[in-house]
């Protein structure tokens, strides 16, 4: 209940980018346009350091959330960001380049064209949104090797500066 309420309050603060529906529909083939019963939403996790959600940011995370309208069941599929796929301009590049070069409409077009999807809606989040969600659920417990602890501490310094949030240095476990 409390996590849902917190998440709902954050949704109202989401930065929105207007994309013409016609632009998204251009990448939907006639065959998949007529499929119904599901709502497919593209989810992009961006490497944005300045809070922007438009082109120029690579999508480190690319997922498709598919909602079965009859049952309410949601399935998530991740698309590996380094997968070589056809971009909106006909060239081939890593999947995460589509958002950077063409913005969210290019990211959605990439999924529609290469995955035979009918996606018309998308959600883009940056580091701040990820930190807020982790805080809302009370943090995360991870098992890390000593080498991973070193990398996480380095990463946390940058993330802390970007998000304006404090963090506690991770100490290796002593056995």
Predicted regions and their residues:
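Non-catalytic, solvent-exposed segments at the cell envelope interface
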Residues: 3-175
